[in-house]
Amino acid sequence: MAKEIERKFLVKSDGWRSEVSSSSDFLQAYVASGDDRSVRVRIMDGKRAKLTIKIGRELLARDEFEYEIPLGDAEEMANAAVGVVLQKTRHEVRHEGYTWEVDVYDGAYKGLVVAEVEVEDEGALPDIPDWIGEEITGDRRYSNMVMATEDLSGELCHGVPSAAR
């Protein structure tokens, strides 16, 4: 079991684009969700798939179990998704010793751009790049599970700066 500790931010500009080291297209579907746990399937670049179980109420730190699964199984699970299937492109950006994951959403959340950084403990805060905006760690509306199961696309995509999209 791994403990996932990550901070999440809105992205306010496209200054990160010139620093991208890799990118992957994700299709992310929730098979089950509850107040303190979720089961999701993720298909990466249409070629690989993972099943992830997250347990814990805190959005900053949760237990995470992740397993590679056959692509066909993942596609079948995605077809049985609860709510909206999320579509996004994840870009990795290195900054001051940390890897930032910048998610550019498509589909229902087109226009939303968020960045996450995994940290070693709950008090850690890495050097913040200038393209990072408001911290949204702990704001449940930006949890992928909530976005998928409650469809907040109208609320979350409103007012996103066009430069960040």
Regions found by a protein language model. Name each.
Residues M1-R165:
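Phosphate-end processing signature that detects enzymes handling 5′-triphosphorylated RNA
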